Amino acid sequence: TLVDAGVAADTRLFAIALRFLAPERPLRAGEYTFSAGVSLRDAVAKLQAGDTVVRRVTVAEGLTTREILAVIEGAEGLSGPTPEVSELGEGAMLPETYHFSLGDTRGELIARMTAARDAGLTRLWEARQDGLPLASPEEALILASIVERETAVPAERARVAGVFINRLIRGMRLQSD
């Protein structure tokens, strides 16, 4: 509470002060941080503006779905259950840094991650080169994952992808480790 945080001396006094400091603008719910010795006026302004704490979780590229779900499970401030790996499949979530607020659910975050992946994949699929031997955006994602596993050097990825594309055109196996 604001009293526990030292922002207000008393709840009743704070309620009275609100009538004078914020008669027409409601306070917004959320998690806030206040600097030591913050004035009541500044605290109310922050509560009205909704200047809440923004938390974040970073999902690195190259993680499996199981590893991503472990990162999400360990993110402080998220609520709700974490789905099973089998509910999502590999490559379902875009690796990125995601921002969230205290109390957001893991399901909501995962929905944002899958929507971001879908939007990015659609954009890339629509801009792809003609004549590639790939039948769907998902096949392109699988090939991209294989290429990333094959080389850790970004400058080599186009050449490695070219080798795999040529093998697919010829009906050969990819023969990737």
PLM features per residue range, with description:
Residues 1-175:
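Conserved catalytic or metal-liganding residues and their short signature motifs at active sites
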